[in-house]
Design a protein with these regions (language model features):
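Short Gly/charged-rich anion-binding patches and loops
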Residues: 3, 34, 220
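Generic structural signal for hydrophobic core residues of well-folded globular domains
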Residues: 12, 43-46, 182, 229
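Catalytic-core signal marking the mid-to-C-terminal active-site face
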Residues: 14-22, 26-159, 166-171
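Alpha-helical support elements that line or immediately flank enzyme active sites
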Residues: 1-11, 239
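Accessory "access/gating" subregions that flank catalytic or transport cores
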Residues: 162-239
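Short, functional N-terminal and low-complexity linear motifs
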Residues: 9-10, 26-28, 140-143, 189-195, ...
Length: 239
């Protein structure tokens, strides 16, 4: 939804007001999944890959304070193409419509506008196809490759090895940043249950220990996992 909102923003330069309607399952899960916040961020010009997680609360507060973005939840209707549908409308200062588009969240970070075809997830076919873990092991053995080598060979069917490495570096950096932020951010998670963050307390307790045992190592892994879960619940950037 953030990507869809950001893309719609390009279709409505200079708009004075926005109205967004979420349909079907996207409406039902919207608030629980932070969809309304994601749309506000997108219409504020933000993108998932580049937004600073530490700035999200401030950006949202500013977007809400403007009062120019209305979001409705239509629980009873689905758009024809997909259950995760959104309708964006933009208006000028006189209240006249200047743009309207339907967008769909297709999963996996992919979006589509109106009747446009779904974006291809790959630009080519894998060099060594497999569909199950068993066929993956067989393909690796048949080609005398490790699993990592086989996957790299497939990835380089549509990207250069340098592009694959750069993409992995970005993903790893995002994962590390997510863990780090989750471990250092105290407070209450969003939602009506008022759940306190646990990961920072676990980090402090484990850091006070001297010699680390195998059990402590497992506790660190648990702390990292909880940190990521809490960042996800708080609307942070996760992989």
């Amino acid at each position: 939804p953030m990507k869809a909102a950001r893309a719609f923003l390009e279709s409505a330069p200079g708009a004075a007001r926005f109205h967004v309607t979420l349909f079907g399952s996207l409406a039902w899960t919207g608030k629980g999944h932070g969809t309304d916040s994601a749309i506000l961020l997108g219409l504020a010009g933000q993108e998932p890959e580049t937004i600073d997680p530490d700035a999200i609360d401030e950006i949202l507060a500013e977007a809400r304070a403007t009062g120019i973005i209305d979001i409705d939840f239509n629980y009873d209707r689905e758009l024809e193409r997909h259950t995760n549908g959104m309708r964006f409308a933009a208006f000028d200062e006189n209240g006249d419509a200047v743009a309207e588009e339907d967008w769909y969240s297709l999963g996996g970070g992919f979006i589509a506008r109106g009747d446009e075809p779904e974006p291809a997830s790959r630009a080519g076919e894998p060099r060594i196809a497999f569909t199950t873990s068993e066929s993956l092991l067989e393909a690796a053995a048949d080609n005398n490759l490790s699993i990592a080598e086989l996957v790299m060979r497939n990835e380089t069917a549509w990207l250069s090895e340098a592009e694959v490495d750069a993409g992995l570096d970005r993903i790893w950096s995002a994962m590390q940043s997510c863990i780090d932020r989750g471990l250092r951010t105290d407070g209450i998670l969003p939602g009506s249950l008022s759940v306190s963050r646990r990961a920072p307390k676990l980090r402090r307790a484990l850091s006070k220990k001297g010699e680390q045992s195998a059990i402590d190592a497992m506790e660190w892994v648990n702390a990292w996992a909880i940190a990521v879960n809490e960042e996800n619940a708080a609307g942070g950037r996760v992989v």
